[in-house]
Amino acid sequence: MKLRDLERHLRRQGCVSFREGGAHTVWLNPSTRKISSVPRHREIKEGTVHGICKQLEITRP
């Protein structure tokens, strides 16, 4: 999945970009107060996307 598509999905689920590090962006789900680190690569593997969505307690795209 492309990073741009994942970010769009996270925003639609109500998540916000919390802070940025070297190669990762930390996303926050304000309703559950859960956070997850999202790598800034062009392509993100489906297993990684699944883990991010699971940590943030949102549906998978």
Model-identified regions with their sequence ranges:
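Basic nucleic-acid-binding interfaces
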Residues: 1-20, 28-61
